[in-house]
């Protein structure tokens, strides 16, 4: 695989979205901002929502929808790498934001569900009817770990539903090509889960005690981050520590790993 570096100096970039003009819009989690990287590598500021913009997607109205973790991480330097660590003491929760790409205007559309504050929204994917799924990563402090959840919401801000709760560090989320299954990854367990859907936003109750149908795990120590699903159904998973992208084919035992010379691969998008 040929790899080229497009831009440097970004503050923990994630959530890339490939635009029609060849640019990439992404978040800088540690910078609290959203940035466009042009084809020649030049950077342009889109918005500065603050907190910790984490996941990003284009909605049906052409706006950016942002999973903002509310500054859920502090950062440490380790072996020349910047690594997310425990939440700072001032972290109070996160939110879902809508951002006008042209003006940079930021609007909070969700920060609670059923009266409970969103902890740290992480990744987001839209379905074909204009609703979106997102993960809430939960948080880690010196007192322990707070579980996360999987949500479904309407883009107009009118309804949000917690579909699964008590998940351990849910991160990447994607939909099967037919839209009948939502896949999500857990970072700390290094597992990929699938949840069959009965209709948009409604999951099937899975027998037993698992939070979905087990869809895969890396054969060794690895953490999972974001994911995308290809047209053929393979779930491409950013695989931390293993240094690459691991492709799972839910419902089969097929697993493929593409090495990348970086131990902390955190996000991916389709483009071109």
Predicted features along the sequence, with ranges:
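A short helix->beta-strand "capping" segment at the edge of beta-propeller domains
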Residues: 1-11, 39-41, 110, 207-214
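Beta-rich, blade/repeat-based domains predominating
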Residues: 6-23, 49-80, 90-95, 113-132, ...
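Beta-propeller domains
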Residues: 24-47
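Hydrophobic/aromatic beta-strand positions that recur at structurally equivalent sites within the blades
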Residues: 27, 36-38, 99, 153, ...
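Short, solvent-exposed loop/turn segments at conserved positions within beta-propeller repeat blades
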Residues: 29-30, 74-93, 138-148, 187-189, ...
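A short loop-to-beta-strand structural motif that recurs across blades of beta-propeller domains
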Residues: 33-35, 94-97, 148-151, 191-193, ...
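Beta-propeller blade signature
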Residues: 88-104, 147-156
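Short loop/turn segments immediately following beta-strands, especially the blade-tip
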Residues: 195-205
């Amino acid at each position: 695989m040929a790899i080229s570096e497009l831009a440097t100096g970004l503050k923990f970039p994630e959530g890339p979205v490939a635009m029609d003009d060849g640019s990439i819009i992404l978040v800088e989690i540690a910078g609290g901002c959203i940035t466009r990287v042009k084809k020649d590598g030049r950077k342009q500021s889109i918005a500065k929502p603050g907190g910790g913009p984490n996941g990003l997607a284009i909605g049906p109205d052409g706006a950016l929808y942002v999973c903002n973790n509310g500054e859920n991480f502090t950062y440490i330097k380790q072996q020349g790498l910047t690594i997310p660590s425990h939440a700072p003491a001032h972290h109070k929760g996160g939110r879902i934001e809508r951002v006008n790409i042209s003006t940079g205007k930021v609007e909070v559309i969700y920060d609670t569900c059923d009266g409970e504050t969103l902890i740290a929204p992480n990744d987001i994917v839209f379905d074909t009817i204009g609703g979106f799924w997102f993960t809430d990563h939960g948080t880690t402090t010196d007192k322990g770990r707070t579980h996360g959840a999987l949500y479904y919401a309407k883009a107009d801000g009118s309804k949000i539903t917690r579909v699964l709760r008590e998940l351990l560090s849910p991160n990447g989320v994607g939909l099967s090509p037919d839209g009948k299954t939502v896949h999500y990854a857990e970072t700390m367990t290094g597992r990929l889960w699938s949840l069959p859907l009965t209709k948009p936003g409604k999951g099937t109750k899975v027998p037993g005690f698992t939070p979905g149908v087990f869809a895969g795990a890396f054969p060794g120590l690895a953490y999972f981050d974001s994911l995308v699903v290809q047209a053929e159904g393979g779930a491409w998973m950013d695989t931390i520590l293993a240094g690459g992208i691991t492709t799972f084919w839910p419902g089969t035992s097929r697993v493929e790993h593409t090495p990348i010379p970086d131990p902390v691969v955190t996000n991916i998008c389709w483009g071109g």
